[in-house]
């Protein structure tokens, strides 16, 4: 008799790891057979979906307000107490399934991915992957806190970007330089985070037996149908065919705007001198 899963993830948002354990124990203890493997897989899939919804919810809370320390703490708690344990238990379930020899119909592609995940897994990487996720959120917090004073109001750099669509070139230049200056203020902090991320990712690759992070990431993303060399070939094709076309388009833009030199703040404005459309001002409208 299976343990009934919650009807939705809302009930699970404040769960500790102990609340999750019985569901994984049930999946791990059940003897697989040709008659129950489909049901077992569905139960596992439904459980994973619920956990994913919880993770998405706590993650989104950190993006709504990057300065919300409570949301940050909930996200970190989920990563450390739930996500790491889920990954470890899922590894055992994947091995159990693969060793059973059973497979649902039309499962060839997911099966290939599962085999890849099992080979990629390293218990040592669980805290490192958590650290990587935390560092990424530190970066998001820095970017989210970048604001400037524009026309008497404090605005984010994203809120400033519509100025780039307006026909007043001096204003566009002022806004662009203001945003660039603000970004440069965080250069050192961002570089420090990047160095930490780089070291963390190099360790992740090493723990899984890969010579570099790109090779590890390639397998992690399940890019089975093309290689890094294929991408480099594609890059060279872009350089040969698309870059000259892009240069031509920029030249046409410069001429259409009647400029001697095209600047970064000239790349979004309408080339015919039309003001940007304003379909609405707020959600109510």
Language-model regions: role of each:
Residues 1-281:
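A well-structured
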Residues 283-285:
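Amphipathic alpha-helical domain-onset/packing element
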């Amino acid at each position: 008799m299976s343990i009934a899963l919650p009807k939705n993830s809302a009930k699970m948002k404040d769960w500790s790891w102990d609340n999750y354990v019985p569901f994984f124990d049930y999946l791990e203890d059940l003897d697989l057979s040709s008659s129950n493997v489909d049901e077992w897989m569905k139960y596992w899939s439904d459980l994973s979906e619920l956990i994913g919804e919880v993770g998405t919810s706590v993650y989104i809370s950190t993006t709504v307000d990057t300065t919300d320390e409570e949301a940050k703490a909930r996200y970190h708690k989920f990563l450390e107490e739930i996500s790491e344990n889920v990954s470890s238990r899922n590894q055992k379930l994947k091995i159990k399934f693969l060793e059973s020899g059973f497979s649902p119909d039309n499962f060839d592609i997911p099966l290939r991915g599962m085999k890849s995940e099992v080979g990629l897994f390293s218990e040592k990487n669980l805290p490192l992957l958590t650290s990587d996720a935390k560092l990424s959120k530190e970066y998001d917090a820095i970017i989210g806190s970048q604001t400037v004073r524009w026309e008497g109001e404090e605005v984010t750099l994203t809120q400033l970007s519509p100025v780039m669509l307006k026909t007043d070139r001096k204003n566009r230049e002022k806004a662009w330089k203001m945003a660039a200056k603000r970004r440069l203020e965080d250069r050192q902090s961002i570089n420090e985070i990047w160095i930490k991320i780089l070291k963390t990712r190099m360790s992740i690759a090493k723990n899984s037996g890969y010579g570099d992070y790109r090779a590890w990431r390639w397998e992690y993303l399940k890019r089975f149908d093309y290689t890094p060399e294929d991408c480099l070939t594609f890059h060279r094709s872009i350089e040969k065919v698309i870059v000259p076309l892009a240069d031509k388009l920029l030249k046409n833009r410069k001429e259409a705007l009647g400029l001697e030199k095209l600047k970064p703040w000239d790349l979004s404005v309408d080339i015919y001198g039309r003001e940007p459309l304003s379909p609405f001002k707020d959600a109510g409208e």
